[in-house]
């Protein structure tokens, strides 16, 4: 009997071991599937799960009762394209549908689905234009100096424009989540944001000691690593926004798309892209840019170098959507036009077809001072003599002649 019991136990152990192996293999496959998912989609699923768990709490007698009929869907009900508020004494408001997709037919995906994901990015990654109120010891000029320095670092290490704009987004969103940051920490936060962005975007990012070197001893490698973890926790690991330059790349690509509809490789003139990107490089130094979504900023910059019709075609925006941003961007566009378009820079080791994507640095702070001076002059002129609300048209020629005869 002991031998039979031992053999039985041994067989049970084998069965349990086999089940463990199958469970482990399934876990490995599940981990691979999770790894291949979009990080934003995974975070959204986690948030949805947490909300569902909160909704499944025990019944609370003190909670307000809700009409159960509101949870019963009406069968065979046609959905309206525009949702309307219930009619009241006030004028009913309508929710505007999302702007139409300007993307061409894609051979690698559904253009409507791609456009929907792009629009959801703007809703997910929000910024706070008043984040400096959380930091009484900081000024808007300090942010401009830091971003100008990050542009210079990007040019030295031949980093892409997308890398810089990712770092700018990480910095602004991190500062909006903190309080009472002192001036001496700004450089550490900025270089840590660029360190994170370079690992996400660059194929061969600079080493950690290279980022510490450009700070001239102000930040050590260990401090950058510590700040990196603090920033990612504060950002809740949301590290894949659609930046300003990403929107610009889409708009210009759609504007110059060929008959084949191929959009995987750039089809636009590099000089055109660089000229508009220089305007955005200047605008992003002003903290006022945080008032507008990234897509609106890119569309407004494109408008200043093209036309209203082209902007509407490639972005889906209407004039009312970008009017405020276009007017805000006027002094910056005036400075860029006075400076003239800079020549396309070529970098050693960078292919010619990718040279326009490398972040460049100019005397951005001087240009920012000129733009802010023009902004003050324009605001003063508008205060003294505000522009007419309607377009004035001359009278017909027949009335002109009759009025002239009467005066004689």
Swiss-Prot record:
SMART domains: CYCLIN, Cyclin_C. Residues 1-17 have a biased composition (Basic and acidic residues). Phosphorylation of both Thr-393 by GSK3 and Ser-397 by CDK2 creates a high affinity degron recognized by FBXW7, and accelerates degradation via the ubiquitin proteasome pathway. Phosphorylation at Thr-74 creates a low affinity degron also recognized by FBXW7. Ubiquitinated by UHRF2; appears to occur independently of phosphorylation. Keywords: Cell cycle, Cell division, Cyclin, Nucleus, Phosphoprotein, Ubl conjugation. It is found in: Nucleus. Residues 385-397 have a biased composition (Pro residues). Residues 1-27, 379-408 are annotated as: Disordered. Found in adult spleen, and to a lesser extent in adult testis and brain. PANTHER family: CYCLINS (PTHR10177). Belongs to the cyclin family. Cyclin E subfamily. Interacts with CDK2 protein kinase to form a serine/threonine kinase holoenzyme complex. The cyclin subunit imparts substrate specificity to the complex. Part of a complex consisting of UHRF2, CDK2 and CCNE1. Interacts directly with UHRF2; the interaction ubiquitinates CCNE1 and appears to occur independently of CCNE1 phosphorylation. Found in a complex with CDK2, CABLES1 and CCNA1. Interacts with INCA1. This is G1/S-specific cyclin-E1. It comes from Mus musculus. The lineage of its organism: Eukaryota, Metazoa, Chordata, Craniata, Vertebrata. The gene is Ccne1.
């Amino acid at each position: 009997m002991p031998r039979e019991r031992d053999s039985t136990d041994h067989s049970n152990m084998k069965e349990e071991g086999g089940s463990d192996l199958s469970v482990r293999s399934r876990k490995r496959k599940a981990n691979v599937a999770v790894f291949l998912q979009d990080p934003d989609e995974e975070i959204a699923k986690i948030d949805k799960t947490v909300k569902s768990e909160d909704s499944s709490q025990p019944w609370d007698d003190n909670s307000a009762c809700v009409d159960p009929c509101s949870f019963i869907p009406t069968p065979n009900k046609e959905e309206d394209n525009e949702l309307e508020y219930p009619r009241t004494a006030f004028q009913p408001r309508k929710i505007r549908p999302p702007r139409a997709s300007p993307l061409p037919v894609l051979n690698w995906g559904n253009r409507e689905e791609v456009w929907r994901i792009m629009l959801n990015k703007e809703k997910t990654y929000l910024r706070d234009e008043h984040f400096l109120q959380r930091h009484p010891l900081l000024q808007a000029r300090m942010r401009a100096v830091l971003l100008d320095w990050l542009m210079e670092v990007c040019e030295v290490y031949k980093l892409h424009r997308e890398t810089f704009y990712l770092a700018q987004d990480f910095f602004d969103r991190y500062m909006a989540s903190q309080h009472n940051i002192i001036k001496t920490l700004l450089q550490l936060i900025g270089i840590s944001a660029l360190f994170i962005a370079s690992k996400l975007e660059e194929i061969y990012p600079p080493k950690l000691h290279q980022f510490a070197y450009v700070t001239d001893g102000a930040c050590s490698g260990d401090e950058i690593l510590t700040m990196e973890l603090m920033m990612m926790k504060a950002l809740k690991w949301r590290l894949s926004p659609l930046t300003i330059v990403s929107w610009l790349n889409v708009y210009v690509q759609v504007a110059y798309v060929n008959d084949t509809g191929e959009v995987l490789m750039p089809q636009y003139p590099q000089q055109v892209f660089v000229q508009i990107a220089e305007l955005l490089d200047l605008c992003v130094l002003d903290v006022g840019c945080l008032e507008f979504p990234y897509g609106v900023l890119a569309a407004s910059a494109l408008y200043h170098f093209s036309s209203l019709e082209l902007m509407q075609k490639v972005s889906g925006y209407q004039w009312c959507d970008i009017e405020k941003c276009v007017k805000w961007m006027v002094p910056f566009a005036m400075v860029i036009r006075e400076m003239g378009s800079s020549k396309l820079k070529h970098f050693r080791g960078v292919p010619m077809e990718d040279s326009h994507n490398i972040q460049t640095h100019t005397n951005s702070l001087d240009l920012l001072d000129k733009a802010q001076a023009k902004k003050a002059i324009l605001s003063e002129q508008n205060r003294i003599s505000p522009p007419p609300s309607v377009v004035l048209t001359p009278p017909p020629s027949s009335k002109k002649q009759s009025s002239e005869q009467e005066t004689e």
